[in-house]
Amino acid sequence: MRERNAAGIGMTSQRTRDRLVDALAAQGIQDERVLSAMREVPRHLFVDEALESRAYENTPLPIGEGQTISQPWVVARMTELLLEPGVPERVLEVGTGSGYQAAVLARLVPRVYSIERIGSLLRRARERLQAVRLFNCQLRHGDGYEGWPEYAPYDGIIVTAAPDALPEALLEQLADGGRLVAPIGGAGYQELLVVDRRGDAYEQRRVAGVSFVPMLEGRV
């Protein structure tokens, strides 16, 4: 991957990034830790060069293989919800995609474990995370429905594609006292769900309507 300018210029400059973060705050994102992480992570490095000029628009963008980098507001809100009970020590992300959500998490928590089913996306995400010198992310080519049992339990789990229902394996890998944030539902419209584990009980609440790509089984 050709070396790119993390600082950015013009439509990828720090000033443009700051304007996006200010807009996120105006739209209800309150956690200063999350806003700071979004300010620090160069989103333009996590999209193709042809889309760099749109990187700081508050919109999802295609990343290839029928996948997208999530809308910044959604990344911020899901991260904010994950951190609400306290900073988790270990977070599992299901759906690495571009690597951007993992990069934001890596600014905020000690360890990030991220699974991606599409090998070509995983390779590019690994290169991008190395380029921005975030080394506390461990990536795996695998089926998100199976989770990553070797490093379970996780204090936080964040799912960046939408299953029809919560995968049982992910609930089992959530630590007691941990929190899971995921979009649930069919193609086109889902609800963002927050799940808190209390022993063998799982408390759920719906937060907002969202639209994510579907979560698929297997790996390619």
Swiss-Prot record:
Its EC number is 2.1.1.77. It is found in: Cytoplasm. GO terms for biological process: methylation; protein modification process; protein repair. Pfam families: PCMT. It is an enzyme of class 2 (transferase). InterPro entries: PCMT, SAM-dependent_MTases_sf. Catalyzes the methyl esterification of L-isoaspartyl residues in peptides and proteins that result from spontaneous decomposition of normal L-aspartyl and L-asparaginyl residues. It plays a role in the repair and/or degradation of damaged proteins. Belongs to the methyltransferase superfamily. L-isoaspartyl/D-aspartyl protein methyltransferase family. This is Protein-L-isoaspartate O-methyltransferase. The gene is pcm.
